[in-house]
């Protein structure tokens, strides 16, 4: 008799996705981040659900309800900090996952890649609206500054901003709708992640060499389930260390001050995982130009498959491209640092140079390196 997991309609789907899935035998730990993102998503939905049971999305009580969660709810402080730091872990895994895709040419699976870009945008939207909910100073002013960027859109900008606010400023209506968005978006992310996996399993996984591995596949279970469990344990260990020892390390002290529309914080900045984009936004001394650069800094990922000039898929055997890739990583770290600094002399020019280098690397230098490496193959 055939095993039930191969015959039952539901079990069969799970079996084909996580048990008998043919997987390249040589994928490295960089391929762990997909499953870690799944783990982060489940964890965020669960902690978020318990927080939503005690949170009130109203300007007069939101800040107090978060304080109430931390003080009066059993292990409320733990759930709250798991959720806040879980978002940071989510973005660390997300950026590592995208970096892996860029390095090894996984973007050549275009449907999977495009759904991935859509997932990134949705996760960023979720994190942004979520940051507004505690209704601290940085929540309020972050929401004001970022939503206000839409007013740069010609003709409809101002109307659009007031429509999103639900009034003439960030107020009760804004907070209520942001809570609604923050609740629904993770479920949309879950659905998109399922489609992401569906498209991936149409082609099978890429591998570090970028060479088709159809002749050398092994079953996902037990070989990669055990490897994923190790990754999951390391992720949980890091998250617990962060949550239990330094829960506020990645947060902003200003968010412990209740939102006050009459007092602007000295330095308005988003959470660390948006700082690179914020630095690109600030580096252009024009509102519309900055907004366009901000959008393009993320949407540029869609054009990556079209910018592939090399005959080789992966960067494994392409030293010039490797050098440029790690330069890009260093550039993004520089932008992240600049995004958190005040707008004054040395930082402004460094931010502008780093922003120019970001677009130059992706649009010009990397495709050129690919062409040069093609020439070198003939030597």
Swiss-Prot record:
SS bond partners: none
Gene Ontology biological process terms in this record: mitochondrial electron transport, ubiquinol to cytochrome c
Transmembrane domains' residue ranges: 33-53, 77-98, 113-133, 178-198, 226-246, 288-308, 320-340, 347-367
GO cellular-component term (any): mitochondrial inner membrane
Chief site of localization: mitochondrion
CDD domains registered for this protein in UniProt: cytochrome_b_C, Cytochrome_b_N
Membrane topology recorded in Swiss-Prot or TrEMBL: Multi-pass membrane protein
Function: Component of the ubiquinol-cytochrome c reductase complex (complex III or cytochrome b-c1 complex) that is part of the mitochondrial respiratory chain. The b-c1 complex mediates electron transfer from ubiquinol to cytochrome c. Contributes to the generation of a proton gradient across the mitochondrial membrane that is then used for ATP synthesis.
Name this polypeptide is given: Cytochrome b
Organism the protein comes from: Delphinus capensis tropicalis (Arabian common dolphin)
Gene expressing this chain: MT-CYB
């Amino acid at each position: 008799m055939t095993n039930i997991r191969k015959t039952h309609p539901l079990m069969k789907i799970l079996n084909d996705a996580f048990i008998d899935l043919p997987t390249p035998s040589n994928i490295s730990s960089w391929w762990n981040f997909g499953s870690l993102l799944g783990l982060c998503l489940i964890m965020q939905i669960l902690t978020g659900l318990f927080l939503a049971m005690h949170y009130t999305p109203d300007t007069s009580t939101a800040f107090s309800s978060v304080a109430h969660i931390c003080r009066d709810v059993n292990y409320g402080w733990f759930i709250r900090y798991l959720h806040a730091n879980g978002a940071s872990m989510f973005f660390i895994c997300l950026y590592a996952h995208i970096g892996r895709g860029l390095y090894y040419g996984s973007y050549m699976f275009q449907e999977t890649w495009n759904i991935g870009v859509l997932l990134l945008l949705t996760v960023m939207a979720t994190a942004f609206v979520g940051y507004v909910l505690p209704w601290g100073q940085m929540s309020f002013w972050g929401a004001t500054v970022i939503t206000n960027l839409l007013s740069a859109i010609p003709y409809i900008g101002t109307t659009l901003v007031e429509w999103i606010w639900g009034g003439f400023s960030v107020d009760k209506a804004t907070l209520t709708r942001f809570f609604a968005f923050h609740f629904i978006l993770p479920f949309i992310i879950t659905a998109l992640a399922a489609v992401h996996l569906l498209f991936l399993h149409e082609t099978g996984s890429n591998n570090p060499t970028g060479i088709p591995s159809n002749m050398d596949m092994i079953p996902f279970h037990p070989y990669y389930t055990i490897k994923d469990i190790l990754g999951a344990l390391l992720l949980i260990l890091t998250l617990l260390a962060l949550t239990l020892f330094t829960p506020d390390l990645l947060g902003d002290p200003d968010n412990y001050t209740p939102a006050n529309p009459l007092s602007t914080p000295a330095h308005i900045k988003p959470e660390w995982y948006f700082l690179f984009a914020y630095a690109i936004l600030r580096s252009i001394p024009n509102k519309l130009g900055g907004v366009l650069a901000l959008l393009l800094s993320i949407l540029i990922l869609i054009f990556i498959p079209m910018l592939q000039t090399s005959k080789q898929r992966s960067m494994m055997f392409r030293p010039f491209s490797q050098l440029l890739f790690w330069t890009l990583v260093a550039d993004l770290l520089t932008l992240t640092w600049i995004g958190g600094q005040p707008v004054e002399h040395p930082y402004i020019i460094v931010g502008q140079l780093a922003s120019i280098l970001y677009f130059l690397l992706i649009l010009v230098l990397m495709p050129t390196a690919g062409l040069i490496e093609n020439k070198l193959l003939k030597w």
